[in-house]
Curated annotation (Swiss-Prot):
Record protein name field: Elongation factor Tu
PANTHER family referenced in this protein's UniProt entry, alphabetically: ELONGATION FACTOR TU, MITOCHONDRIAL, ELONGATION FACTOR TU-RELATED
Location(s), subcellular: Cytoplasm
GO molecular function: GTP binding; GTPase activity; translation elongation factor activity
Subunit structure: Monomer.
Region (G3): 81-84
The entry's keywords: Cytoplasm, Elongation factor, GTP-binding, Hydrolase, Magnesium, Metal-binding, Nucleotide-binding, Protein biosynthesis
Residues annotated for Mg(2+) binding in this entry: T26
tr-type G domain: residues covered: 10-204
Region of interest (G4), ranges: 136-139
Length: 399
């Protein structure tokens, strides 16, 4: 079947839903597609479509990151429904890195919970520039005062993580009622999308820089070859162009023989697009999540770097005890988790310290066990045992 071409007639924005488990992120995502489908701006999806594979739904917990697409009057959106359960924060770190903005879903019945806070912190760490709040399950709260209190609490929380709490729109919604077709609540979904259009700035695309795409997933398509999927971070890539596969193993050259977005063919993919790239002569085993596809000669992988790091306090979900030089955590870089070592550190003012306490800001030297495409100015998270314990930025490449 010939695939239809993707029409690029509206600005494209990547957003997603974040927030505490069971606050209604997936239901709200489904409601958005259903409300917009009535205007011909989306394909309606139900909860099951978005929640994905059966074993995840049996536990009632979303594990994988689901992608849906829809349009508003002025924009085309790719929307990721991020995992909410604490165990899957790892997925969120890799998923949230793709967001130009996020809808923070918070249930009016509960108010902000542990993961609400963790997701706001993560949004800050991975550089999500703007948030809009969907105060969900408002059909279940009769008392206007309770809603006002929850709104105040959310605004204070946003402020504490350096988001502009007073300015961020909070829209009262009910994903479930909107899904059931209740017109009052459907109009609140439209109000939410108007707020998203207005408050999430159109991203500045880095189209003119050399092409780079971090690999998120790899598929083998019988008779066609290997497809790598991911979000193009910068630059553009045309069919027929040579690209390099960099990181984890030896760099190798391949040719892009096809570019697809949402099952439609493109002549070229541009910064911000979530695409699948068909690669010539590459086996599925040759490429894995965490590698990057780049313009030939534009980037080399590295193992040693200096970074500026904030180590989370115990109250923020970080470590309870100090760590010392030689500490071996996981470094989350783009879509990769790489084991590494913090070989040396000083206090952020350059003075010597024996150990790093939760809440400290440090300058550190890190060494990774395998080479990865790290660059100056890039953000990373430091994790251990399934939780974020630090957030940093690469200040200098050493080797």
């Amino acid at each position: 079947m010939a695939r239809e071409k993707f029409e690029r007639n509206k600005p494209h924005v990547n957003i997603g839903t974040i927030g505490h488990v069971d606050h209604g992120k997936t239901t709200l995502t489904a409601a958005i597609t259903n409300v917009l489908a009535k205007k011909g701006q989306a394909q309606a999806q139900d909860y099951g479509d978005i929640d994905g594979a059966p074993e995840e739904r049996e536990r009632g917990i979303t594990i994988n990151t689901a992608h849906v697409e829809y349009e508003t009057e002025g924009r085309h959106y790719a929307h990721v429904d991020c995992p909410g359960h604490a165990d899957y924060v790892k997925n969120m770190i890799t998923g949230a890195a793709q967001m130009d903005g996020a809808i923070l879903v918070c249930a009016a019945t509960d108010g902000p919970m542990a993961q609400t806070k963790e997701h706001i912190l993560l949004a800050k760490q991975v550089g999500v520039p703007a948030l809009v709040v969907a105060l969900n399950k408002c059909d279940m709260v009769d008392d206007e005062e309770i809603i006002e209190l929850v709104e105040m609490e959310i605004r204070e929380l946003l402020d504490s993580y350096d988001f502009p709490g007073d300015d961020i729109p909070i829209v009262q919604v009910s994903g479930l009622k909107a899904l059931e077709g209740d017109s009052t609540w459907e109009s609140k979904i439209e109000e939410l999308m108007t707020a998203v259009d207005a408050s999430i700035p159109e991203p500045e695309r880095e189209v003119d820089k050399p092409f780079l795409m971090a690999v998120e997933d790899v598929f083998s398509i019988t008779g066609r070859g290997t497809v790598a999927t991911g979000r193009i971070e910068r630059g553009k890539v045309k069919v027929g162009e040579e690209v390099e596969i960099v990181g984890i193993r030896d760099t190798r050259l391949t040719t892009v023989t096809g570019v697809e977005m949402f099952r439609k063919l493109l002549d070229e993919g541009m910064a911000g697009d979530n695409v699948g790239l068909l690669l010539r002569g590459v086996q599925k085993e040759d490429i894995e999540r965490g590698m990057v596809l780049v313009k030939k000669g534009s980037i080399t992988p590295h193992t040693q770097f200096e970074g500026e790091v904030y180590v989370l306090k115990k109250e923020e979900g970080g470590r309870h005890t100090p760590f010392f030089a030689g500490y071996r955590p996981q470094f989350y870089i783009r879509t990769t988790d790489v084991t590494g070592q913090i070989t040396a550190f000083t206090s952020d003012d350059g003075s010597n310290v024996e150990m790093v306490m939760p809440g400290d800001r440090i300058k550190m030297t890190g060494e990774l066990i395998c080479p990865v495409a790290i660059e100056q100015g890039m953000r990373f998270a430091i994790r251990e045992g399934g939780r974020t314990i630090g957030a940093g930025v690469v200040s200098k490449i050493l080797k």
